[in-house]
Curated annotation (Swiss-Prot):
Gene: rgs-5
Gene3D superfamilies assigned to the protein according to its UniProt record, in alphabetical order: Regulator of G-protein Signalling 4, domain 2
Gene Ontology cellular component terms for the protein in this record: mitochondrion; plasma membrane
Biased composition (Low complexity): 393-414
Compositional bias per record (Polar residues), positions renumbered to this chain: 18-32
Domain RGS: 81-205, 214-337
Protein name, UniProt field: Regulator of G-protein signaling rgs-5
Amino acid sequence: MSSFLGRLRRKKDKEQNGHTATSSDGAYQNGNAHRDSLVNDHICIPAQRNSLTVAQQSADIGSGSDHEGIIVKQKPQLAFSLDRLLIDSSALSYFIQYLDSTDKLNLIKFWMHVEGFKSSFSEQIQAAQELSLRDAKSIYDKYIDDGSTSSLALPRKIKQIVDDKLSASPLQKSCFDEAQDFVKSLFEYRYFDEFQNSVYYKKHELEVLSDGCSLADILKVQPLLLSFLEFIKEKEDHDTIQFLLGCDSFEANLDLMEDSEALGDAMALYEKYFSMQATNMIDLGSAIRAEMESLICEESGRPNRKAFRTAKTACFFRLHDKYLSDFLKTSYYHNYLGELQSFIDFTVELPRKVRNRAASSSDVASSTDSLTHAFSRHLEVLEKKMNDKDESTQTPTGSPSSSKRSTPRTPRSSRLAEVDEMGRYHALYDDSHSQTPQKPMRIKSTLRKYLDKNTLREEEIAEEVARTIIRDMQEMVASSAESPTSPTFRYG
């Protein structure tokens, strides 16, 4: 695993702050090749330059910040897509930590071992082919075989395909492709989304954004995007950001739309931002407008994926050159870094799940005893508080309430509720959360108080009669207990 990460780091260093283009950020990365063509009309895009180091201004950052400087980047730095994550050694290390915490480390280990197998595979050299065959057997025994502790539990159909490919001669480089595609689908549809919501992705964000940031990163991070919109004052530049976001959404969903729907969305973007009657005009010149028109209205009836590519590149670099350097100096940006740090510091990382599903009975018993002990301690504290309250409200000896409260309580005899001398139920805990909230009927209560006095009087008399009867019964029982002989009742 370490050798694979090392190769990724060396590859990243050679690319000099770049990465392989993906569908989500390829337009931004490939935009440099079109800067020379963007001098049409009055559009002036400065020549490509190296990354800029933005000196931090202490007045903007606020006290306590330890970020000495943020580098302006032209290419995305954060791993927004799974494809970028799998080739970014730094982001991949956090993804590995996340999978380890969810007891799914075997998935990423299989992926990395297969990538290493492919990179070292050779059909020309006999010794290398024998080594590849040995590696393939090792991968199969560890991850494909159902009896292995690290088995991926592949679907039967995929496992059969892998078996057939490994049985064929000569061995092919693509023998694990179906299994690798299955694992990648698990990453894409489950674990990558969960990773982006975890503390491990926040650590990746903090590490990357503390070193450098691009406009593409800001457009992907919602808190930074909102701060960037607040930082920008000119309305046309607000429209430019909205166009970039709308264009990203259009390109991401283009393959899922019918021709007519795709054409309608493309025309909506064009008419809102670039047509002569645009409501939110972004003036990029007539040449770029004509290019968009020709790529949107093609003979096939479906807009070209590159219809907004030139306009998107021009808008991107306009915002990049005009605002990014100053924005990275502001408290907006550094406050977000502080929020990331606070989130990480105050997040409790739960221990990794137990890998052995069949836990021993002793472990279960130990856990149960611990829980019982903790619950008993809680009852003792609760009982002590209740006894203290009873002592403070205790009436003189001999009264009915005194005899009622004189029974000592232990944790095992603690009650969650009691019934008073009137037969009414009283909870000894706060049960307000379990009761259905009712709106106070203040008018009804007031009317009842002043207009229904007879009913209230009858209720008071009934309660007093009940108290008298109960008191007489208690005195009768007490006197019979003190007499030497009990009365004999005869029937008939």
